[in-house]
Curated annotation (Swiss-Prot):
Belongs to the bacterial CoaD family. Keywords: ATP-binding, Coenzyme A biosynthesis, Cytoplasm, Magnesium, Nucleotide-binding, Nucleotidyltransferase, Transferase. Pathway: Cofactor biosynthesis; coenzyme A biosynthesis; CoA from (R)-pantothenate: step 4/5. Substrate binds at residues 40, 72, 86. ATP binds at residues 16, 87-89, 97, 122-128. GO terms for cellular component: cytoplasm. This is Phosphopantetheine adenylyltransferase. It comes from Dehalococcoides mccartyi (strain CBDB1). Its EC number is 2.7.7.3.
């Protein structure tokens, strides 16, 4: 089975990587799909985000990383995927994922959704919160990979 784990990953967190690691255990191939939305650019380019994830998943043998734009179900179809993986942190995530599930099912009934609860230490972790912590001079260790932390500090210093 081929699964897609989509997201912005701006930047990728240890919570994201935890979901990817767990999902890779029950699918033959997992594609981490970095959403590239030109209308809403992030702090990092899609290419930078793909590179950060590639550096972080070297030990995940059945996981690959690609960027995509447009509808996620179209990308999933193109990749031959039948499952979308999403991580759930807090209650608001459930509501958003339910909305997306209903719309994705309307667009393609052949693609299922699997939501994985975040591990407790990552329940309130978000890319936005990471950026705020770093901007305010806080310690991001244990929240993002070291190579991502260095790139984030450098990027924020130049903004």
């Amino acid at each position: 089975m081929i699964a897609i784990y989509p997201g912005r990953f701006d930047p990728v967190t240890l919570g994201h990587l935890s979901v990817a690691r767990r999902a890779s255990g029950f699918c033959d191939r997992l594609i981490i799909a970095v959403f590239d939305n030109p209308a809403k650019p992030g702090l990092f380019t899609a290419a930078e985000r793909v590179d950060f994830i590639k550096q972080s998943i070297k030990d995940f043998p059945n996981v690959e990383v690609r960027s995509f734009s447009g509808l996620m179900v179209n990308f999933a179809r193109k990749m031959g995927a039948s499952l979308i993986i999403r991580g759930l942190r807090v209650g608001a995530d459930f509501e958003r994922e339910m909305e997306m599930y209903v719309m994705n099912r309307r667009l393609d009934e052949g693609i299922e959704l699997c939501c994985l609860f975040s591990e407790p230490q990552y329940q309130y972790l978000s890319a936005s919160l990471i950026k705020e912590i770093v901007i305010l001079g806080g310690d991001s260790s244990g929240l993002i990979s070291e190579h991502v932390a260095v790139a984030l500090k450098n990027k924020l210093a130049s903004v």
